[in-house]
């Protein structure tokens, strides 16, 4: 079997970077939709933290786009899936846990593609983003567990809390949300 050309290897990496970017775009749309819904339900603290996670996902999407451009590719601008709308508070965090878990699995696969194609910079990018996605997963699982175990008592504690993230927000990871 002939060795892949440098251009073929680069295209393989661009392909997984674009797939990851599309996944991030979906997460942004999904989490912002949930932010608005939770804010409307008056669960400000939960709305705020989901918005901060969405901001992290925006940063991830931008990081993938920059790497794609460095490799000579064109970053995708479309999401991979449709947004789940009108979710109940209890559904949101189970859904988001599954979304993050799937993302982590896919990114680990993409990392291997980058490694197999000799792109250590993209490998490091995926490692960094996977670490942040694992923090998001931990947060979503924690809230999901609280909702499952405490139900309306937990939501009553959250009701009426502010949803504002302030003027400029660094995101969930950079701003150390859910402290």
What function would you assign to each model-found segment?
Residues 1-179:
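Iron-associated oxidoreductase/ferritin-like identity signal
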């Amino acid at each position: 079997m002939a060795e892949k050309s440098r251009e073929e290897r680069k295209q393989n990496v661009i392909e997984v970077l674009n797939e990851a970017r599309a996944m991030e775009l979906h997460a942004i749309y999904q989490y912002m939709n949930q932010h608005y819904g939770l804010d409307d339900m008056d669960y400000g603290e939960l709305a705020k933290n989901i918005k901060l996670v969405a901001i992290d996902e925006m940063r991830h999407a931008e990081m993938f786009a920059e790497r794609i451009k460095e490799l000579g590719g064109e970053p995708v601008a479309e999401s991979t899936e449709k947004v789940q709308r009108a979710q109940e508070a209890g559904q949101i965090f189970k859904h988001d846990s599954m979304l993050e878990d799937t993302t982590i699995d896919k990114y680990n696969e993409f990392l291997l593609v980058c490694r197999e194609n000799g792109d250590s910079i993209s490998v490091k990018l995926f490692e960094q983003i996977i670490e942040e996605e694992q923090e998001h997963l931990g947060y979503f699982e924690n809230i999901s567990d609280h909702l499952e175990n405490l139900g309306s008592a937990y939501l009553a504690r959250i009701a009426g809390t502010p949803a504002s993230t302030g003027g400029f927000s660094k995101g969930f990871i950079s701003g150390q949300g859910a402290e």
